[in-house]
Amino acid sequence: MQYKLLMALSKLVCLLPHGALLAIGKVLGHLYYCLISKQRELAIRQMMQSLGISRSEAEHIVKASFVNLAQNVLEILYMPRLNKENFSKYIKIDHPEHLTDSLAKGHGVVILTGHIGTWEWLAAGLVFLGMPVTAIAKPQPNMQYTNVLNDLRATCGVEIFSRGTSELLAAARALRKGKILGFLADQDGGPAGAFVEFFGRTASTPMGPAVFSRKFKSPVVPTFILRQPDGGHLIHVLPPMELHDTGDPDRDLIEDTADMTHIIEDIIRQNPTQWLWFQHRWNTPPDEKTVHHHVTAREGEADGKKG
């Protein structure tokens, strides 16, 4: 029932012009800010601590971030309207050569990104630009929501692999075939994550981008989509990362993850209204850290070979 309702809502949303969609999102975002006090207070508290700003400043930015989130949700439902002919009306890209040159090396590309801007449109925009895009995504607690998201992504030609499942084997094959594999690397990584600094605090961080890059010799290209003042979107592509190679694979993995986290932090600092500040990003305390397996063990998992 939820699946049918959401897909019906998507069809209704797709009847609207994009400008009307953004206007509705603005109203819904303000309502969300006023009504959902738990997430609002968590976002304000985390922003004050992370950015070192006053409560009034944080309230202003968080309100704008809730508007951005509401617009994001509507734009996700709007994805069936996007196609190769019209996407350039909504999405621009800078420095695509960082991606095309990296793809030309033949080892696939790991895209490092986060829940910034309308992140679902990032993969869609790259597909319409002619790039072979796949991504790893965390399944939603409600499987019907996951199915809705995956079906909307499929309308734009984006292939999704579920995190924490056997589909990671298919993700590995995608890199072997020279495709792009995207990672949202700004969530809590649990006890098995790398504990690195994020906004001045130790945070468990997913190591997937570093692990897959190391295993398949794939360049890591930080890529983000940012909402612009006119309501459009810019895919912002940074140069490929210089990864560590000290001869200590475990240490290199942690250092690479730390560098990736710093890049995401810098983008958030530059665009604080476009991140999900109510995420439980610092949910796993450092004392829950588990012993990391050697990188080669993780590489075996990526290949489906468990010791």
PLM ranges: what are they?
Residues 1-113, 155:
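Membrane-anchoring hydrophobic helices of lipid-metabolizing enzymes
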Residues 8, 20, 43-46, 122, ...:
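Hydrophobic alpha-helical segments typical of transmembrane helices
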Residues 28, 50-63, 101-103, 128, ...:
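Non-catalytic C-terminal accessory region of glycerolipid acyltransferases
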Residues 35, 90-91, 114, 141, ...:
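Residues that cap or flank secondary-structure elements
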Residues 38, 93, 117, 143-144, ...:
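Residue-level recognition of alpha-helix initiation/capping sites
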Residues 68, 105-165, 171, 191-196:
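Catalytic core of membrane glycerolipid acyltransferases/transacylases, capturing the structured
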Residues 86-91, 138, 157-163, 199-200, ...:
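Short, flexible loop segments at the rims of nucleotide/cofactor-binding pockets, characterized by
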